[in-house]
Design a protein with these regions (language model features):
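ADP-ribose/adenylate-binding Rossmann-like module
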Residues: 164, 201, 206-207, 217-242
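Short amphipathic alpha-helix with an adjacent loop that forms part of the alpha/beta core around
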Residues: 188-198
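Short, structured coil segments at secondary-structure junctions
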Residues: 177-179, 222-223
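Short glycine/serine/threonine-rich phosphate/pyrophosphate-binding segments
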Residues: 147-150, 210-215, 236-237
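Conserved SAM/SAH-binding loop
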Residues: 185-190, 210
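Segments forming oxygen-rich coordination pockets for charged ligands
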Residues: 1-166, 170-176, 183, 201, ...
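Active-site-proximal loop->helix
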Residues: 172-178, 240-245
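Adenosine-phosphate binding glycine-rich loop
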Residues: 230-294
């Protein structure tokens, strides 16, 4: 979580009184060379604490950043570049003195969050290390009402989104707050313009079953981790039967989530967007869990 001297924050360490007290502390550190760990007692007992029913103790690492420092500026540029490229990386923050670092690989320790000990300059220092994985792009086929409701939600959840439609008026970026890219395409020639990776998500919300079939035909030939198609059970079955007749197998078609989204009895575009977002959150969490078990 980042906080500035005004109390404005980005991210969270869990909310509640712990976060409130941590932000208050961080506000006093702006512009200072302050790197330290502070213990917070979450209890409600006679010996003090933050009065939180959950109880326990938490260690919070405070690391003051001066944006004018050339080394900090260089670090931030490197982090932004790696994030834009979609590469996994490790963020390393020293417990006391020193600068944050980016590492592409980390052999020491276990888990996606680690406390390491590094020997540098004749002394041993503890380092906090956290893994950041790029979890794929969301390619949305169809720029109608549903896509316009879906993109802002997914963007807020940290998903990278691209919207495609064969109608230029439905690819105007201003229709999709938070979108990274839009493109007017021919749904029958997607393989000429898209290189889908196994970590990517394909969301099919076109205007009709013919376009759905064109996109689904393309999607089934990709390694995408998720393929979802909007529509009634009758429409999705029609497209499935059509693709079976073309030679696709039931096993291949079972990759497709159709109708798309989790079942929350959604009806409006806004409600369906929430059901799709929930399903993508679930898939992303499952993928992250598998990565962390390896």
């Amino acid at each position: 979580m980042a906080a500035d001297q005004t109390g404005r924050i980005y991210g969270t360490i869990g909310g509640g009184n712990l976060e409130y007290q941590a932000v208050k502390k961080a506000m006093t550190l702006a512009g200072k060379d302050a790197h330290f760990v502070e213990d917070f007692d979450l209890g409600t007992g006679e010996n003090g604490g933050l009065g939180m029913v959950c109880g326990g103790k938490v260690k919070v690492l405070f690391y003051s950043v001066k944006s004018q420092d050339p080394k900090i500026a260089s670090f931030l540029k490197e982090a932004l570049k790696i994030a834009e490229e979609g590469k996994p990386y490790w963020l390393l923050l020293p417990f006391s003195k020193g600068y944050p670092k980016i590492e592409s690989h980390l052999e020491e320790g276990r888990g996606h969050c680690r406390i390491l000990e590094k020997y540098e300059n004749d002394e041993t220092q503890k380092i906090y290390a956290e893994e950041f994985n790029f979890d794929g792009k969301v390619y949305i086929f169809g720029g109608g009402h549903l896509a316009q409701e879906l993109v802002p939600v997914l963007s807020h959840l940290g998903f990278w989104c691209m919207v495609m439609d064969d109608r230029e008026e439905y690819t105007a970026p201003n229709l999709f707050p938070g979108v990274q890219e839009t493109k007017t395409v021919d749904f029958t020639a997607l393989s000429d313009i898209l290189k889908v990776k196994k970590e990517d998500y394909l969301v099919v919300v076109t205007r009709g079953h013919r376009c759905d079939a064109d996109v689904e035909r393309f999607a089934l030939r990709t390694p995408a981790s998720y393929i979802g198609v909007v529509g009634s059970k009758r429409k999705t079955q029609y497209v499935r039967d059509k693709l079976l007749a073309e030679g696709f197998t039931n096993e291949e078609l079972d990759r497709v989530h159709a109708p798309i989204g989790i079942d929350i009895a959604s009806e409006t575009p806004a409600e369906i967007a929430i059901s799709i977002a929930a399903q993508l959150i679930q898939i992303r969490a499952e993928k992250a869990g598998l990565r962390r078990k390896k």
